[in-house]
Amino acid sequence: MLDAIYGPDPRYNYTSSQVGQTPLGGYTKTLANRHALKNATFGIPWQSFWVYADSEQQAVLLDIVDLMRDAGATIINGTELPNHETIVSPDGWNWDYGTIRGFPNESEYTYVKVDFYNNIKSYLSELENTQIRSLEDIVAYNYANDGSEGGNPWPLGTPAFYSGQDGFLASLETKGIMDETYYQALNFCQTTTRELGIDAALAMGPNQTGLDALIVPPDVAQTYQVAAQAGYPVITIPAGTHSSSGMPFGLALMQSAWKEEVLVKWASAIEDLQFASETPYKRTLPKWLGYLERNIPVIFDG
């Protein structure tokens, strides 16, 4: 799927930076088996992310880490993001954590609100099947169709839209203005999650070498929040299911910019190791009747 979706889009300027950064011939060729793990080195940012995982997930994921170690990988604990106490919310995913700390110029939400206002206007300008052309139009439509679109928060509106359209209203308030606070927040979030964040943790290999990846628990939402702020890739491997809820969870690898091929290599090697071992913590196959069957449309005449 990655091979099918990557590549620059001339209509989407954000994609142009990948030119020259992707592997020639695609990502499939980077797939590896468990033997590739020998002499690989991974870091565990325990205080940055792992402490927020529940004990059951910690136990399962650490069993997989032990498998990796047995396969020849080196595991280094304590490879922390230097600014994790500042940028990682202890209470779960929170993209306005900077404002909660009293610093809107250190909040991801500060620039997300502005970017959304401008980008949704650009997107709507190309649609031909609607008269809605701006965030103002969307907000007005939601108010006019409160029962189905959730314009008002509960109890003024419907409980299905408990907070109404608070995100839209917050974005609307910015009017898309990229002011000094916008640029301060953007610079802070990118710097503290990139060179002073993930990149710094990846540099904590033995003898001043770099790590092949950071191992993180992706059910801890702060992991992908930090990666998203940095614009860095994360890949998740199936790991297990919660005993009480039956909900699945995974083990994730985090890397720096343009390191998708590295993540594909190590994720495929770990998954091969899971299947080659006796561990129950791996991708589970469907067991329902007929899951291998394919529905084929049949045209009946007359």
Please identify what each model-predicted range represents:
Residues 1-59, 276-301:
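A short helix-breaking turn/cap at a secondary-structure junction
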Residues 55-57, 88-111, 224-225, 229:
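Short glycine/threonine-rich loop-to-helix capping motif typified by GTGT followed
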Residues 48-52, 81-86, 102, 109, ...:
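Solvent-exposed loop/turn segments at secondary-structure junctions
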Residues 5, 62, 163-302:
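Glycine-rich, small-residue loops and helix-cap segments
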Residues 13-24, 83-105, 206-207, 289-300:
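Surface-exposed intrinsically disordered loops and tails
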Residues 29-49, 96-196, 238, 244-251:
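Short helix-loop capping/hinge segments that flank enzyme active sites or metal/cofactor-binding pockets
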Residues 1-26, 51-86, 105-147:
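Acidic-enriched catalytic cores of C-N bond-cleaving enzymes acting on peptides and small amides
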